[in-house]
A protein has these predicted regions:
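Catalytic cores of secreted or luminal carbohydrate-active enzymes
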Residues: 56-110
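Generic, low-specificity signal for short hydrophobic/alpha-helical stretches with a mild N-terminal bias
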Residues: 54, 86-89, 140, 179
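Extracellular/luminal regions of secreted and cell-surface proteins that mediate adhesion/ECM remodeling
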Residues: 95-233
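Catalytic-core regions of glycoside hydrolase
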Residues: 1-78
């Protein structure tokens, strides 16, 4: 969508974006190239000064936030130069705020159990970004899922439990995910294990497929380490 220029991005387009919000990813298209023929300084909003492309970039950013976009469209040389030379602070800000930023806000689990026992893990998820994780589109349908796992002291993943009811595309600002998952501890030997949680790619042996917005010190090969489990025979 041609964001930023109010003479192009009018109410009907805003309504269109609103109708498809969190149903399909929305891409931010630039609103005025400094070296092109867009005379952005005559925009009806009166916000933009001639020779100040950073004014347009800020307008684009604000409209992108309102439209809950998933991606910035940086593809034309003069436009990219404008973003990086005059408005790089907004590019960095989009890295923190835009798209989807998924992480587990709370994970509750047992730390002692017996082999073969069934235990419950409660986990809550939040999206910090404006956009959404588009697992509802045909290309990604069923591809990425929440998974709870156990790792032994040799760093081997010995147990995985998919959370099929968790729909990542529904985690949007103001709407967290809350789940309780049963994990059967069959086949586990006596010893110590580490609880892990992650967003896995079901087409690649349920290995971590999406990065979480989690401190890297808490991660092991894409999994988030959440606690310890001791198995007693």
């Amino acid at each position: 969508m041609l964001l930023g220029l109010t003479g192009y991005y009018e109410q009907w387009e805003k309504d269109f974006a609103r109708a498809y919000r969190f149903r399909l990813p929305i891409i931010m298209e630039e609103g005025g190239l400094p070296g092109a023929h867009h005379r952005y300084w005559i925009d009806p909003s009166g916000k933009y000064r001639e020779g100040h492309s950073e004014d347009v970039r800020l307008g684009e950013y604000e409209e992108s936030r309102n439209a809950h976009v998933n991606m910035m469209d940086l593809r034309i040389g003069d436009e990219v130069a404008s973003w990086f030379n005059t408005s790089f602070d907004l590019v960095k800000r989009f890295e923190r705020e835009g798209g989807y930023r998924l992480y587990p806000t709370k994970v509750s689990f047992v730390n002692k159990a017996r082999s073969g026992e069934q235990v419950s893990v409660q986990h809550n998820w939040r999206n910090l970004g404006w956009g959404y994780c588009p697992t509802n589109i045909p290309q990604w349908k069923g591809k990425y899922k929440v998974c709870i796992a156990l790792m032994d002291t040799h760093h081997n993943i010995v147990k995985k439990q998919l959370v099929d009811e968790a729909d990542l595309s529904t985690w949007v600002q103001g709407h967290d995910g809350h789940y309780t998952t049963t994990v059967k501890l069959d086949g586990l030997q006596k010893g110590s294990y580490t609880w892990l949680i992650g967003l896995v790619d079901t087409t690649k042996a349920c290995q971590p497929g999406l990065k979480m917005a989690v401190d890297k010190n808490l991660l092991f090969e894409g999994w988030c380490k959440v606690g310890k489990l001791k198995i007693n025979k």
